[in-house]
Amino acid sequence: MKIENGVAKKYRKSVDDALDAIIAQGNDDHKRVTKLILDSKMLIQVKPVSEVKASGVTGVISPWRTRGKLDEPMGLKEALGEIYICIAEETIDTGGQRGCEGTLVHEGRHAYDFAQMIESLSEADINPLKVFDPTLYELELAAHKTAGEYMLCVNRGEYINEGLDLGILGKEATGQCFVSDDGIKLRLKTNYSVTHDGDQGRLASEIVGLR
């Protein structure tokens, strides 16, 4: 992983600390994805929210360059090197470490799924039936679920409260919290206008400009 030149020291430290925390506190999937990112040449950017337009966003650094590489099989780690995650400065300024961790867990899942998509497209001539190209609904469902699972792993007040406020987590009558499939699906319908049995949105390859 590499952090873009020019990113302020405090943001670099926040990103490094967040990735360390995810490995220390997350489940096996969180650890696996984060370690893959750290071992790759994936790019991390930090920019004002006026440019990012969200707490974080994930995409392909250069779609035309990546398209040119799809003629040859590409491994997952190499594919991650085609990806960037951009975090809004305000995510760290106002959300602190929790905000940075949560964004990296969510966007890290997108980065992993985009890399899987790129890897599968590069092998499409060999394995045309194994192309992985999820819809926006599938991408966001996976990212929201992994974010909810991380909140439960950390199991501290501010993390749990954020999950409950966002509808990602639910609470049993006993007080036990859980990842809420219904809450996440409602959030996807409200915020992204996608549903399981209706419009699932564009394919990952279309979202990042590879098709």
Where is each model-derived feature located?
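Extracytoplasmic/secreted proteins, especially bacterial periplasmic and envelope-associated proteins
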Residues: K10, S14-D17, R32, G99, ...
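Active-site scaffold of zinc-dependent metalloenzymes
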Residues: V57-E101
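Second-shell loop/turn segments in exported
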Residues: K2-V7, L19, E90-T94, R98-G99, ...
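Residue-level detector of alpha-helical secondary structure
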Residues: R12, D16-I23, T34, L38, ...
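Long, well-structured alpha-helical subdomains associated
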Residues: L136, G148-R211
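A metal-dependent hydrolase signature that marks the N-terminal structural subdomain at the beginning
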Residues: M1-K69
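Short active-site segment of divalent metal-dependent hydrolases/proteases
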Residues: V105, R109, D113
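Post-HEXXH active-site segment of zinc metalloproteases
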Residues: R98, G102, F114-L141
